[in-house]
């Protein structure tokens, strides 16, 4: 009985470690039936003062179609005080950005998807990210 409990405990811990490790690779947020997965180089831990790239890895819409050509997507990067660093049309899945200081930042990705009934449905997701110091 004790051996089985130990086995189940170790198995649960291993599953938890795998889940936590893989969850740290990308951030996923959802709004209005649209899930967006974002990644920031390197490994979602950008370094302040060094140019990096924000990648939109995946856009998945429930009962709707996403296309870069028609989404009217925008990417906005801002610091914790609300000062906007980048606010531009996102016509491709990557946007270059340089986080100036080692602080907390926000990334907002917005756009629209075309529903199966032909109507457009807007979405807007926001992520938190912290830029590390360039030691």
Which sequence ranges carry the predicted segments?
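N-terminal soluble domains immediately following signal/targeting peptides that reside
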Residues: 24-135
